[in-house]
Amino acid sequence: MGVEIWLPLERWKDQRCFRLRYKVEPEPRPFLTLQPVKVSPDPEWDPRWEEWHCYLIPLTIDIQDYQQLLAGCFDRVFHTKDPIDGWPMDSLDLCSPNWLGEEDWRTILTAIRGEMGEASRRKRKFYDTFLRWLEAALTHTSIIVAEGNQ
C-alpha cells in the first residue's frame, strides 16, 4: 500500500509543505503555494476551502524565485478561464487563489522544459524538481490552486 496523498478534510493542518528554493533568503518571505484540489465528480460541486488544502505535500516557492524563474512560463497560460466557473483570468494574482486546470499546467510544463536547455545547472535542478512535483500532482488532480500570500 502506498502513501495516501489526500488528507481527511478536517486534517488540513497536517499538510507538509515542500519548500522549493533557488535563492536562500531569510524567513519570512512572500511565497506562492501550489495546492492540488481534491476534485469531485458532482456536477454541482462548489469546492470548499478544505478541498484545496488537503493534499499531503503542497509546493511552496518564494515569490522572488517565482518572479525570476517561473513567471514567464506562467504568463503563457493567460488569458485563461477558471476551470470551475469559467471566470476569465488575465494574470496570476499573487494576493488571492488562482484556479488553473490541467491544460494550463501542461502549457506551463512545456514552457519550463523549453527554459531548461539554456539554464545553468542550478536552475535546471530547480526546474527539474518543480516539474517532478507538478507531474506527480497532476496524476492525482486536474486542478491546482496557485495562491500567494502578498
Predicted segment positions?
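Acidic (Asp/Glu-rich) sequence patches and key acidic residues
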Residues: 1-142, 148-150
